[in-house]
Regions:
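Structural motif of enzymes handling amino- and sulfur-group chemistry
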Residues: 36, 232-305, 309-317
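Conserved PLP-enzyme active-site core in the AAT-like
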Residues: 2-14, 28, 78-274
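N-terminal "arm"/small-domain region of PLP-dependent enzymes with the aminotransferase-like
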Residues: 2-60, 65-68, 356
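A common structural junction motif
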Residues: 235-236, 322-332, 375-380
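Acidic-histidine catalytic/liganding microenvironments
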Residues: 72, 272-276, 322
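Conserved C-terminal alpha-helix-loop-beta "cap" of PLP-dependent enzymes
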Residues: 280-356, 360
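PLP-dependent enzyme catalytic core of the Aspartate aminotransferase-like
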Residues: 1-6, 127, 257, 320, ...
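Conserved N-terminal alpha-helix of the aminotransferase class I/II PLP-enzyme fold
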Residues: 39-89, 93-94, 110-117
């Protein structure tokens, strides 16, 4: 890498730290009179003879976003998709017909739905494993084609050893994919733990403003990138240039948003522990969490907190009684969200009916706590 201070921000030789690269990467070349931000290219086709020909194959605004994501993930390439589920679907399309996917027992409900649907259709077989910091899944991996990792898991916040599981999978000849939505590359780059494919719901923390839906897959494998590009092009699973622009804009503030949200989440989790009505708090930043040491050494605690109260009715009433916390699904935006996760009929039956999931935003932490406390107190 170059130490030349004249290296432009868009150069892969830059040695700037990730909080700087989130701001600087993916911008146009610094020519006199050039725009500071990547333009929104609204064109369905392009002049012949250049790198782009038709809008289903590529777009300059995507290119800037994908280049930025690849840089942040420390990978050779990244591809964007119209949603996180579309990105997951594309990765599952890499599995051969009749193959085997090894997946956690309690993944994100969208992942679970895709796995169940494809297994029911005979596309591939799914073997489940129970995530833990010391999980040995060598038996499940025998003859497998793909290992799926999700850490922290959504919404139970189970922690897995990314490096350890990746080693086990590669020893069995399987590819490794991870849903790194809760982590973000600001905290850790899973590719450095041996993962082959890093998947994000860009909708969440990366874009960070709850105003666009998008997914991504990053990889160091040219072969996998080519196959994913073909899957995207033939399936038409492309993103709009405006959504790509919004994601780029959101990434500029990723560092400051994550720092604030994680600090807020830690405070909220610690204060929840003091309330008699709260039966359990799930947050990797707490020393009582079974995956605490591993999480803090690798992927961090994140900005999602889950807690359980006495009953499902009580949990629902609390979620409906906040004023600052928005009662809505999703996570990762600047605004704080609250919901009883099991209100969704497609959620895993093992998710407790009395579990409340918090996506902690960047508001003042005392305002967040006071609002949550009044909602809990009103139904205690």
């Amino acid at each position: 890498m170059s130490n030349d201070p004249s290296v432009p921000p868009t150069s892969p030789d830059s040695e700037w730290k990730i909080s700087t690269r989130t701001v600087s990467h993916g911008r146009p070349a610094p020519d006199p009179g050039a725009p500071v931000n990547e333009s929104i290219t609204l064109s369905s086709t392009f002049h012949a003879g250049g790198p782009l020909d038709y809008g289903r194959v590529g777009n300059p605004t995507w290119t800037a976003l994908e280049s930025t994501l690849a840089d942040l993930e420390s990978t050779q390439s990244a591809l964007c998709f119209p949603s996180g589920v579309a990105a997951i679907s594309a990765v599952l399309d890499l599995v051969p017909v009749g193959g085997v996917v090894v997946a956690p027992a309690h993944p994100y409900s969208g992942t679970r739905g895709l796995l169940n649907e494809r297994q029911s259709a005979g596309r591939f077989t799914v073997r489940e494993y129970q995530p833990s910091p010391t999980a040995d899944i060598s038996a499940e991996l025998q003859g497998a084609d793909l290992l799926w990792i999700e850490t922290p898991s959504n919404p139970l916040l189970e922690i897995s050893d990314i490096a350890g599981l990746s080693q086990q999978a590669h020893a069995a000849g399987a590819l490794v994919a991870i849903d790194a939505t809760f982590i973000t590359p600001y905290i850790a780059q899973p590719i450095n733990f041996g993962v082959d494919l890093v998947v994000h719901s860009v909708t969440k923390f990366l874009a960070g403003h709850s105003d666009g839906i998008m997914g991504s897959v990053a990889t160091n494998s040219d072969e996998l990138a080519t196959r994913l590009h073909t899957i995207r092009t033939l399936g038409g699973a492309i993103v709009g240039p405006f959504e790509a622009f919004l994601a780029l804009r959101g990434i500029r503030t990723l560092g400051v948003r994550m720092d604030r949200s994680i600090a807020n989440a830690q405070t909220i989790a610690e204060r929840l522990l003091t309330l008699p009505v709260v039966e359990k708090v799930r947050y990797p930043g707490l020393s009582s969490h079974p995956g605490h040491d591993l999480a803090m050494a690798t992927t961090g605690a994140g900005a999602v907190v889950c807690f359980e109260v006495h009953s499902a009715d009580q949990a629902e009433a609390i979620a409906e009684s906040t004023r600052l916390w928005t009662h809505a699904t999703s996570l990762g935006g600047v605004e704080s969200l609250i919901e009883r996760r099991a209100r969704w009929p497609f959620e895993h039956p093992d998710v407790p009916s009395n579990l409340i999931r918090l996506s902690v935003g960047i508001e003042d932490v005392d305002d967040l706590w006071n609002d949550l406390y009044q909602a809990i107190s009103a139904h205690s």
